Amino acid sequence: MYKIILIAIFALLVVLAGGGYFFYKRRKRNRAIAEILSGGNLIGSWKYSAQEWQQAVAQEFSWAKESDGGGEIFISPSAIYIRSDSADHLIELNGSKVITHASYRGTEGAPLKIRVRWKVIERNMDSNAESTKYYKEDYRIPVPIGKREVAEKVAEWFSTRCQENLAAYTDVVGADEAISIFGDDSF
């Protein structure tokens, strides 16, 4: 009888911990979105027409639906937020993540290119050994016609940030990868 009660209490604690973690992550995400939408720390934003959105979905935003009729993007130093009528997507850029490349060619149809890198240090409790794993994620963000200056401003802002903080850049690049002396990762 006591075993059943202990198992039930343990199961309840696991469910509560999982629910608390989910609530925390959701609240953190909602705060990041609210900060971006307030516009206080915005680097750039633009809207996609229905036709531009269809192209963006076909090329890069596979998580969205073409039938949404348009979409919006908001870019801040800490996140990129993309939304449409049916879905949204938040790309967090804070914490241990470092943008190591940002560029825009400035021609029609050229995307804004952003590379994000981060590292994860895993510790083995038994042997006290550490292993470091390096990760990178590339984002190609379609730029609507007429938003060239905004995309150039975003690319310039992140490139300058990377060049001014080379220590963060070199910290997230593995020893077996080439490092640019200009603080700009090739894409």
Label for each model-derived stretch:
Residues Y2-I75:
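Anionic N-terminal interaction surfaces
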Residues G40, Q51, S78, S86, ...:
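Intrinsic-disorder/low-complexity loop/linker signature
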Residues K97-F187:
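Acidic, Ser/Thr- and proline-rich intrinsically disordered linker/docking segments
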Residues I9, L13-G19, S96, Y169, ...:
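Low-complexity, intrinsically disordered/propeptide-like segments
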Residues I4-I7, S76-P77, T160-L166:
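Amphipathic repeat-derived elements
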Residues W63-V120:
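Phosphoinositide-binding peripheral membrane targeting modules
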Residues G44, S76-I82, R148-V150:
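N-terminal, helix-rich and Lys/Arg-enriched segments in bacterial and organellar proteins
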